Swiss-Prot record:
Changing L526R: In strain: C57BL/6 and Swiss Webster. This is Zinc finger protein 106. Residues 90-108, 118-138, 150-160, 296-311, 577-593, 968-986, 1450-1461 have a biased composition (Basic and acidic residues). GO terms for cellular component: cytosol; membrane; nuclear speck; nucleolus. Interacts with KNOP1. Interacts with TARDBP and NUP107. Interacts (via N-terminus) with RBM39. Interacts with the SH3 domains of FYN and GRB2. The keyword Phosphoprotein applies. Changing G269D: In strain: Swiss Webster. InterPro entries: PQQ_b-propeller_rpt (IPR018391), WD40/YVTN_repeat-like_dom_sf (IPR015943), WD40_repeat_dom_sf (IPR036322), WD40_rpt (IPR001680), Znf106 (IPR042622), Znf_C2H2_type (IPR013087). One of its GO terms (biological process) is insulin receptor signaling pathway. Changing P1188S: In strain: C57BL/6. There is a cross-link at residues 91, 155, 265, 309, 375, 384, 390, 435, 469, 479, 524, 534, 544, 577, 620, 687, 700, 721, 738, 758, 792, 824, 921, 1310, 1335, 1391, 1403, 1406, 1460, 1492, 1509, 1590, 1742, 1869 (Glycyl lysine isopeptide (Lys-Gly) (interchain with G-Cter in SUMO2)). The gene is Znf106. Residues 481-491, 1050-1060, 1360-1373 have a biased composition (Basic residues).
């Protein structure tokens, strides 16, 4: 059943919250409202929290952009809170409507009338509420849950929840998605309500395990605790712990079954009902959107009074989560009422404060969810299925399942349970049962509210989904968005005050709060008790009727809550409240805190909770001031009560504690320390330092919420419990992520979470709408002043975040996106991560944690929570990583990222989070310090410290954690005060110190840093799981590696460190300008060098002089770059140079270490010692030493990339840092130089092997530079090495004939105008096939060198080249061989050599030998490009155009061949290819460029260079000389699944498929002549290339995380290379194999020995989709296409980010580099051409109807393959579509062109070969069709499939000038085909 929402005013029923919200905002509804109340009434816009007088004014408002933006934002928020039920009608309105509907209600059946009439429903709800309350009272919470839930369950089920378990779940999913429908559901009738609740519970329903159990319901809310109890026998524990509270903890399930309406019915029986859970979730969400105040106040009133009314909307769910719930609502498990109460309360509070109908505003708030609703629906649907299936399984096993899913589920359970436990523990042991109930209820309420709120964000559906997920990651996703917000606000309040109050309590509360941030925050969850008291008091005036009833239960609940106020209190303040009412909340919280402090630490926790509650309430009400006062008073009141009930609650806590601790322990294996003796430890913790424990709880609570959001309550709780002390939930979240849910669970979780976290992140593509919606995601109305303020929507949203339950992730995402649009965050991923976990929804693609640097002021807790929502956000991250990227991860963890608006409050809050284990004061202190520190501290440091602390918290006593926190704080402050570079160093040192000081802290820190980083970027689960979860797409491979990349990416994306010192930025700017000048002068030097060489006169001497000059400039540049990088690092506060990538080549060990570090969180361990030695030792010994100068440059660039993370980073190319990298940077800052040095040295060694080529002079210079810069940046070494390699390349070319020559030649060719010479070389080389002897001669001479030297050095060679060039030109007539531009020269240099080699390789492979250094490597690498046709065998005498390679040459030589050059380049490419082994396959990068369904689709794997002019003739030459026979057209059979990549090498067609095999076909016979097996998963890419001599090897990359190297002759697997993630694309050049992984990294291998060289963190957590190479002067470029919609241009030697090419709106699937241009095909159905060197978007080719999977350039034409089953041929210059080739039965996954034959591989496993003939054109003259086919049969197929319907009844032939008419009766169906085919044959041919 889909939960329905009914507008009791308009009598319209909606199936989703979104629809209901849209209706509630609509003029239709407001007209009815005016009809009901009279003209000129106040129309409140819930979304904007603005009241307009009169319908016209309201109409004007809703048509405004601000409102639309707010709606978008709220929808986003509600995406996560979909479960939450909103009150769409306040009490007054409900009464009015009820009166008006009294008659109709009486007329209608009871259920309908109830749904329709508030009165009916009210009584029923009241009765039900009372029953639940009575039950609760009689059961004293645990019993209540125990018995009550079953009672309710059965009752509800009877009422219509019976089917809920099956149908209701889905229903509830949908309904939860539509809190608006809440009222409808409630109204529907008790029965309807029950259905509603079931719907709410649907999460529970999905989790039927909760069905009969309260626990499940809790789970439903998405709190782990409920799951734990549910799944297991823990149910009683939960009951004891929080019969109510627990349920509350499991906000998701709790609300529904526990609370009001449904809750009442459900209350006890329902408690277990999955549906209840869903309702709970819905309520929670509603609460979240309603905000605590509403919850609190209205819960009391609404629970009873409005339960009938509000129950209609949200009453049932709200009942439980409403603020009043804590005291009475807690006892009453009327989620619905609670929700409605919350809504009402919020409205009431608003009314009180604003003097208007708060509910109305609330309703509108709920209405925001409209957009989220849709997503919610989707999520719900998904969840329904998932939950439905899981639910039944989980219902009973839920608890067990939770435990089993430890990482995923357990954490959820844990969170739910631990919160309960904590709450009970926090509370004194006065009345265990009662307290457990009260506390638990309160907490559950909070949790539920939080969960609902968060889920509300994703949508209530999302919430339900989270419930579904809940078993795995119950709350993570739904909570993630709202959760974060709640957590942030709550974190602020809670962490500042609540954290100290009670660890366990806090945890529970926090969980609850997080779950029901919006409603709970108002004092729903956190302030359960306080809120109940507060809310009851506050609401008492408004909701006296419910209050009276609630007051009894509420009294108990309050007492209980009071007992667990610490718990509630802590969570509450920190949750939404703080965010909602930043200043006010803070003050209120402060006052409350003071009161609490006065009371006692334990009590103070309670007080804080109360205060938080009050604050939350106030926030919700929107009358911040009034509410604040009210809150304060309530807070005090609550505190008193809390004190009273705290003691009784302790036993409950204790009782819960064991169970909790068990869960926690399991989950906290990582973070067991804090919760060490989960039972006694936690209790002791609470008792010994209630403040500390409370802090812990708060932190944990935040963490758990985050975890819920992120992973699950269980994870959250675990993190919270153990590590909350250390770090804000954000940090814990990552830890949780690492807890190790099963990879599959994690993946699912991430997907769900990301979906939930991001309202619109279902798709893999970036969801801009999602980002936009984020702004208003808070779901709470903003103050009118805020609405009306002229602030930008995003800013306003951020500022109002505390007030509203903002999904900070989304907010950040939006901000980041905007900044990026402005060019601010330019880069790493110029696009928002698609779905925020887009396709993958892996939220690792969840990794939507934007760079929080922009939100530096935000409260860490809040941020943490988002981080906690990591799972949801994991996906988001990927998808919305852009958003989160903006805020540094550390900020994210520290809270600086989230609470811009709450910066002041946030400061304390983060501290609290950090020192959760510490005393309240300490926590507050830390928060205060951390908040400031966070902004300044680098992501790395903060993340590192906090994660470490978090982890330690789990592993070490709170004492340890505290020190860590302090150290982190100190570090932050230090960093703040120190200059960037200094700070960087300090950060490194501080981090290292804190880490080391914590014993295993080092590892923990690095791990945590990684995790934290990752968690923000990736999903918490992934992070925590690092290893197991790494598999999530977002952060795959190395858990930390992906994570770090995520982080890195975040940083890069955000790239805005608003708080970074401007001076640093200015400095950076100055240095950058200077560096630019120098780089220009360097280019000039290169040009001069080339000219000098070309001149050959005094060239040699001159070249030497110029080389020296160049070296000097390079060294100076390196120094500058180093300085700049340091500054950038300081800005980023993360000093993790991409040196890792740089180092990677030199030290596989380093990379591996790094990976292991990321995975095992041993980054720290890796750090200083190992790297230092390595750095120190290798540099001097290797040529790399000389290269340090250059490495410095590189380092600078690398750092620059890092540094670009800050505001200025946008301009500076920032290398996206993977979480791992970032973590490394954090860990490495101190020993960074040394570490990197080591790695660099290793790299240098590697380079030495292949870099011995470099001249000694450069080495010397480099060594000097290295010595100077070694410590400056380890990256420098690498960079220097790179630079040296370049320089060496030049000088060696002079010095050493072979390698140096090659390098020099290559360099010269690349570097300078040697383009002419290069062109000649190319021509000659490309023509070499023509003259094998000549080719051989030149080839032996080192084609690269030959090119460079012969072109530049020997006139003779040059002349010969020119001759060849001329000859070739003649031969190629159409193959234009224009001179290569400087940019191209390198490319062409390599290519000509390659070409020569191709010819030679094919013939003698002499070129291979001669091709030393880069050239040979290039040739080898070049073979990757299938498209590069080898001119070698211009077998076709008709055209020497043999060299007409496909655009492979583009890949090979992106330099500047003109279009003609492109042809030549293509030719050259083939030569290189052939040299590589006669490999005509398009570059591997192309092969791996495109991915479909995660399967790489080769882009233009074999691009035949058919000059268009010579295109008719098969001008391409296959790599091997034996390709004399012409390939035949037809099909190749054998594959059983999608063909992912295709390459032609030696007259054979190599294909790889998802059927795990690679097949080899003969091009002539088309028979399969061999099969390569061994992979265990789909093979995504392949690359055939030459190795030493004539031997050739096949590399295959697979989703089984391996690359296998086969001997192509014996077909034996020679080696298997293990990688961290799925291998999506391969590319080779310069004797290096580049592998693009799904975690966003590029790993390089030496083709000679298959040794790993480097790891470049490029686009993590988003996958690398395709690779290509190019050259820029002497610099070798690696072009990386990614799923984040951007293409990054990097230094191929060290991975340094040079620039980012943006423009695509979806995943980049394929690339082809030609001359200076990169042609990229994307899922956005377009092909873009960018200038590689400037980053400028030159042109866009449209006309595709689906994703473009392959792009090939053949001369002047571009051939593209598309998923719409067509191959299109475009003219490059005019953009005209020349031809279309069809005939495919499925989507084209890969394509290559060889000898004018197009080879395509399809998704169904079919492979076809079709002749490319531009001379034959068959036009489709069907009306409106403009396609021109190259094959008549394709036209026929097109006509029959696209223009006719096989089932037509009547058909009119719409061919030009034809009016034939066919009918099915005439039996003319057969005639149709014949008729149409005749048209095709007779009338279609057009003269060309």
């Amino acid at each position: 059943m889909v939960r329905e929402r009914k507008c009791i005013l308009c009598h319209i029923v909606y199936g989703s919250k979104k629809e209901m919200d849209e209706h509630m905002r609509s003029m239709l509804h407001h007209r009815e409202l005016e009809n009901l109340k009279g003209r000129d009434i106040s129309h409140e816009c819930r979304v904007c929290r603005v009241t307009e007088v009169g319908l016209s004014a309201y109409a004007k408002h809703i048509s405004g952009q601000l409102h639309k933006d707010n709606v978008d934002a709220q929808e986003r928020e509600d995406d996560g809170k979909e479960e939450e039920e909103e009150e769409y009608f306040d009490k007054e309105l409900v009464q009015l409507i009820q009166e008006r509907k009294e008659q109709s209600r009486q007329d209608e059946p009871p259920s309908n009338s109830q749904e329709v009439n508030s009165d009916d429903r009210q009584p029923q709800w009241r009765r039900e509420d009372r029953i639940p309350y009575q039950d609760r009272e009689s059961y004293s919470q645990p019993p209540r849950h125990h018995r009550g839930p079953p009672q309710r369950d059965w009752k509800w089920e009877k009422d219509g929840f019976n089917s809920t378990r099956k149908n209701s779940f889905p229903h509830s999913l949908r309904n939860s998605g539509g809190p608006r429908g809440s009222s409808v559901w409630h109204k529907g009738a008790t029965r309807g309500s029950s259905t509603w609740f079931l719907n709410h519970s649907n999460s529970g329903g999905g989790w039927h395990s909760n069905n009969g159990m309260v626990d499940w319901n809790y789970n439903g809310t998405g709190r782990n605790s409920s799951w734990h109890s549910e799944g297991t026998g823990g149910f009683p524990s939960w009951h004891m712990n929080n019969s109510n509270g627990n349920w509350k903890s499991s906000v998701r399930g709790t609300n529904s079954w526990n609370y009001n309406g449904l809750g009442d019915k459900f209350q006890q029986g329902r408690n277990r009902n999955p549906n209840y859970q869903m309702e709970d979730m819905t309520k929670m969400w509603n609460k979240k959107s309603n905000k605590p105040s509403k919850y609190s106040q209205e819960r009391c009133k609404w629970q009873r009074q409005d339960r009938d009314k509000a129950a209609k909307y949200r009453s049932p769910p709200e009942g439980y989560a409403s603020d009043t719930f804590p005291s009475e609502g807690l006892l009453e498990f009327n989620f619905e009422q609670r929700e409605s109460q919350t809504t009402k309360q919020t409205d009431t509070a608003a009314s009180k404060i604003n003097g208007k109908n708060g509910t109305k505003a609330r309703d509108k708030f709920r209405r925001w969810t409209p957009y989220p609703s849709q997503k919610t629906l989707d999520l719900q649907s998904a969840l329904k299925e998932v939950i439905g299936s899981k639910s039944d399984t989980l219902e009973k096993p839920l608890f067990n399942f939770s435990l089993i899913t430890a990482g995923l589920r357990k954490p959820v359970d844990k969170t739910s349970n631990p919160p309960v436990i904590k709450t009970q523990k926090a509370g004194p042991p006065g009345s265990p049962s009662h307290k457990a109930i009260s506390d638990g209820t309160a907490f559950c309420e909070v949790a539920r509210a939080c969960s609902i709120t968060e889920q509300s964000e994703p949508h209530q559906k999302s919430n339900k989904i989270p419930l579904l997920k809940s078993p795995l990651l119950p709350l993570p996703t739904p909570k993630s968005g709202p959760h974060k917000q709640n957590l942030k606000n709550r974190s602020k309040n809670k962490e500042t005050k609540s954290f100290p109050s009670g660890d366990h309590s806090h945890l529970l509360n926090t969980s609850t709060l997080e779950g029901s941030h919006g409603s709970s925050y108002t004092s729903k969850s956190l302030g359960l008790c306080p809120r109940v008291l507060k809310e009851n008091k506050t609401v008492s005036g408004t909701q006296k009727e419910p209050d009276e009833k609630l007051n009894n239960t509420s009294q108990k609940a309050q007492d209980t809550v009071l007992q667990c106020p610490k718990t509630l209190q802590n969570p509450l303040p920190t949750t939404p409240k703080r965010m909602e009412n930043d200043a006010k909340e803070s003050s209120v919280e402060e006052s409350a805190k003071d009161s609490l402090s006065i009371e006692s630490q334990p009590h103070s926790a309670g007080n804080s909770a109360m205060t938080s509650d009050a604050e939350n309430h106030g926030i919700k009400s929107e009358g911040v001031a009034s509410l604040t006062t009210e809150v304060v008073s309530c807070s005090t009141h609550t505190v008193d009560k809390e004190q009273g009930s705290q003691i009784p609650g302790t036993p409950e806590n204790l009782s819960t504690s064991p169970r909790n601790s068990t869960v926690l322990q399991k989950e906290a294996e990582v973070q067991v320390s804090a919760a060490t003796s989960p039972h006694s430890g936690l209790l002791l913790d609470l008792k010994t330092s209630l403040e500390d424990a409370q802090d812990n709880n708060l932190v944990k609570s935040d963490g758990p919420f985050e975890t819920e959001s992120f992973e699950d309550t269980s994870l959250d709780t675990e993190l919270q419990k153990p590590d909350l002390n250390n770090q804000p939930p954000g940090t814990l979240l990552p830890e949780l992520s690492k807890l190790g849910f099963p990879a599959s669970l994690q993946r699912d979780l991430s997907r769900h979470i990301s979906l939930k976290s991001k309202t619109g992140t279902h798709l893999p593509e970036p969801n801009l709408n999602s980002a936009r919606r984020i702004r208003n995601v808070s779901g709470h109305r903003k103050n009118e002043t805020e609405k009306e303020s002229g602030l930008k929507p995003t800013l306003r949203q951020i500022l109002n975040a505390s007030r509203r339950n903002v999904n900070w992730e989304q907010v950040i995402q939006q901000v980041t996106k905007k900044k990026q649009e402005l060019g601010k965050g330019l880069p790493r991923f110029g696009i928002e991560m698609v779905p925020l976990v887009q396709n993958e929804q892996e939220v690792l693609d969840l990794d939507e944690e934007p760079d929080l640097s922009s939100l530096e002021g935000f409260q860490w807790e809040g941020v943490s929570i988002p981080s906690s929502s990591g799972l949801a956000r994991k996906r988001s991250l990927s998808e919305s990583s852009v958003v989160m990227d903006r805020a540094p991860v550390y900020s994210f963890f520290t809270g600086e990222g989230t609470g811009k608006e709450n910066e002041a409050q946030q400061s304390p809050s983060p501290n609290t989070a950090l020192s959760a284990a510490q005393s309240q004061k300490t926590a507050m202190y830390l928060e205060q310090e951390v908040a400031p520190l966070t902004p300044s501290v680098g992501t790395g440091e903060r993340v590192g410290n906090i994660p470490t602390q978090r982890r330690h918290s789990a592993q070490l006593p709170s004492g340890h954690i505290m020190p860590v926190m302090h150290s982190a704080r100190d570090l932050h402050s230090q960093e703040r005060s120190t200059p960037l570079s200094e700070r960087h160093a300090q950060e490194s040192t501080g981090e290292g110190n804190s880490l080391s000081s914590n014993a295993s802290s080092g590892h923990a820190v690095s791990s945590l840093a990684d995790a934290a980083t990752d968690s923000s970027c990736t999903s918490g689960a992934e992070q925590t799981d690092g290893h197991s979860i790494r598999k999530k797409r977002r952060a795959t491979g190395d858990g930390s590696s992906p994570e770090l990349p995520s982080l890195e990416r975040k940083n890069k994306r955000r790239k805005i460190k608003g708080k970074k010192e401007r001076s640093q930025v200015d400095q950076l700017l100055t240095i950058s300008l200077r560096e630019e000048e120098l780089s220009k002068s360097l280019q000039c030097m290169d040009n001069k060098l080339l000219q000098a060489r070309a001149a050959l006169q005094t060239a040699y001497v001159e070249v030497q002089r110029l080389l020296v000059l160049k070296q000097q400039i390079t060294v100076e540049m390196s120094a500058l770059r180093t300085h700049r990088i340091q500054i950038l690092q300081g800005l980023q506060e993360t000093y993790e140079p991409p040196e890792h990538p740089d180092q990677a080549p030199c030290s596989l060990i380093s990379r591996e270490q790094r990976n292991s570090r990321s995975q095992t969180s041993f980054e720290t361990a890796l750090l200083p010692a190992p790297f230092f030695p390595g750095f120190l030792d290798p540099p001097p010994s290797h040529a790399s030493l000389p290269s340090p100068g250059n490495p410095l440059q590189i380092t600078m660039s690398t750092f620059q990339a890092h540094g670009t993370a800050p505001d200025s980073s946008v301009q500076i190319k920032q290398e996206p840092m993977s979480p791992e990298q970032e973590g490394n940077m954090n860990a490495l800052p101190q020993g960074c130089a040394s570490n990197v040095s080591k790695e660099l040295l290793q790299t240098n060694r590697v380079v030495d092997d292949g870099s011995s080529v470099y001249p000694a002079i450069p080495a010397v210079i480099a060594s000097e530079s290295t010595e100077n810069c070694q410590e400056v940046s380890k990256d420098l070494n690498f960079s220097v090495e790179q630079g040296n390699s370049r320089s060496k390349g030049n000088s060696p070319s002079c010095q050493s004939p072979d390698l140096p020559g090659i390098n020099r030649g290559e360099e010269t060719a690349k570097g300078s105008s040697g383009s002419e010479a290069c062109s000649s070389s190319f021509l000659r080389l490309s023509f070499t096939p023509e003259t094998p002897a000549e080719k051989e001669t030149q080839s032996p001479a080192d084609q690269p060198e030959q090119q460079a030297e012969s072109t530049l050095a020997s006139a003779e060679t040059r002349g010969s080249k020119k001759k060849k060039k001329l000859r070739k030109k003649k031969t190629l007539r159409a193959t234009h061989v224009p001179e290569n531009s400087d940019t191209e020269q390198d490319v062409f240099t390599a290519k000509p050599a390659r070409k020569v080699k191709t010819a030679k390789a094919a013939k003698g492979a002499k070129v291979t030998t001669s091709q030393t250094g880069q050239e040979q490597g290039t040739a080898r690498d070049e073979p990757d490009s299938d498209s590069s046709l080898e001119v070698l065998e211009v077998t076709n005498p008709q055209l020497e155009v043999v060299a007409i390679d496909t655009s492979e040459s583009g890949d090979e030589k992106p330099d500047s061949p003109s279009k003609k050059d492109a042809w030549i380049a293509a030719e050259q490419n083939p030569i290189e290819t052939s040299r590589s082994g006669c490999d005509e396959v398009s570059s591997t990068s192309e092969l791996g460029t495109r991915y479909k369904d995660g399967v790489p689709v080769s882009v233009a794997e074999t691009q035949t260079v058919i000059s268009i002019k010579a295109s008719k003739h098969s001008s391409e030459i296959s790599s091997e000389p034996g390709d004399d026979e012409e390939p035949t057209e037809g099909s190749f059979e054998g594959h059983q699944a999608a063909v992912n990549a295709i390459q032609i090498f030696g007259n054979f067609l190599y294909t790889c498929s998802a059927d795990t095999t690679v097949r080899v076909y003969n091009l002539v016979s088309r028979k399969c002549v061999g099969v390569f097996e061994g992979h265990t998963s789909k093979v995504n890419c392949l690359l055939v290339t030459h190795t030493s001599g004539k031997s050739s090897v096949l590399y295959t990359g697979s989703s089984d995380h391996t690359i296998r190297c086969y001997n192509i002759k014996t077909r034996e697997c020679m080696e298997q290379l293990q990688l961290e993630d799925r291998v999506l694309c391969l590319h080779n050049r310069w004797r290096t194999l580049y592998a693009g992984l799904a975690n966003g990294t590029v790993v390089t291998f030496d083709i000679k020995n298959n040794k790993r060289q480097e790891i470049f963190e490029c686009h993590g957590p988003r996958a690398v989709s395709c690779l290509a190479t190019a050259q820029e002067g002497a610099r070798k470029l690696l072009v990386v296409g990614s799923y984040d919609c951007t293409i990054s241009v990097r230094d191929a030697r060290n991975g340094l980010l040079l620039r980012t090419l943006e423009g695509h709106s979806k995943t980049v699937l394929c690339m082809k580099v030609v001359n200076d241009l990169v042609f990229s095909g994307s899922s956005d159905q377009s092909v873009h051409a960018h200038n590689i060197h400037t980053g400028e978007l030159v042109r866009i080719y449209k006309g595709h109807n689906h994703a473009v999977t392959v792009v090939n350039i053949l001369g002047k034409v571009m051939v593209t393959a598309c998923l719409d089953k067509f191959v299109r041929v475009y003219e490059l210059q005019s953009h005209d579509r020349l031809q279309v080739y069809g005939g495919h039965k499925d989507m084209i996954m890969c394509m290559t062109i060889h000898k004018s034959v197009i080879y395509t591989g399809c998704y169904d496993g079919s492979i076809q070969a079709v002749r490319l003939n531009l001379m034959q054109n068959y036009r489709c003259w069907w009306y409106g069709c403009t396609l021109i086919f190259g094959v008549v049969d394709h036209l026929k197929q097109h006509l029959l499939t696209d223009h006719t319907n096989p089932n037509f009844q009547t058909l009119k032939c719409r061919w030009r000038n034809c009016d034939a008419f066919f009918t099915a009766r005439k039996g003319s169906k057969q005639d149709v085909a014949g008729h149409i085919e005749r048209h095709a044959e007779d009338d279609s041919k057009i003269d060309s």
